[in-house]
Amino acid sequence: MSRSRSMYIWKLEPVLAAEGGVNKLIEKARRAKLSAIWVKVADGASPYRNVTGAMAATMTNLVTRAHDNNVQVWGWQVPHCPTTQAAQDEAETFRTLAQRFQLDGMIMDAEGGAEFFHGGINEARAYGTTMRQAADALQKSLGMSSNDIPQNITGWLPRFTEIARHADFNFPQTYYGSSPSVASRIDRAVNGNAHLTIPFAPVGAGYVGDGGGCASAQACAERATIFIQLCKDRDYPSYSFWHWAGAPMALWEVLNTTPA
């Protein structure tokens, strides 16, 4: 399998406005040698605004145009799971959306911290189990994307591990923007995820600013170049970047000129 490169999309409508519509977005994805775009489709049990109202038809069109151009569209959900019933309901919401929009894969964007995953180990198990059943029924790949060093968040590791147990791929958020180097951050993530056996496929910092973002557009481009080469050197099956709307032009230029 050739190495794949993906890009997250958080808020689709402003991205489409900036790019000039669905066709232009897909052209840009192709130029950047993206194998897939990863679009937020649900927050908890609620479908996200990228797939509701008038955006539902737009999302359908996006998937159709992407598939016509050999680009996959994966969806991602931020689970909250305050109860086991809620956990099952959230997974069922995701399953319905994945089926309706013919998504190529499903990503559990399960993160530690008060504003993200509310449940305990039982809720984590209920969510992971129901998601695995959904992915199997739909014959979709299932990814886990979370904080790249789960041990850093008090009490998160057991729940993280329980959810990840049901995934096919691990997409750790290696936001290296303020780290001493790209490699140092990836190495910490490798250590933090060493207990998992699924493929490690890191998420790079494709944005400028706080929360692990890069210091400047130029730094974003330079670090992306290092990150891509590191993924090649270590033979990771895939890698991705957070996120489309935050990616400076300098990063797109790297993607346009660097094979995946």
PLM segments and residue spans:
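Substrate-binding cleft of secreted/luminal carbohydrate-active enzymes
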Residues: T174-S181, A189, I198-A260
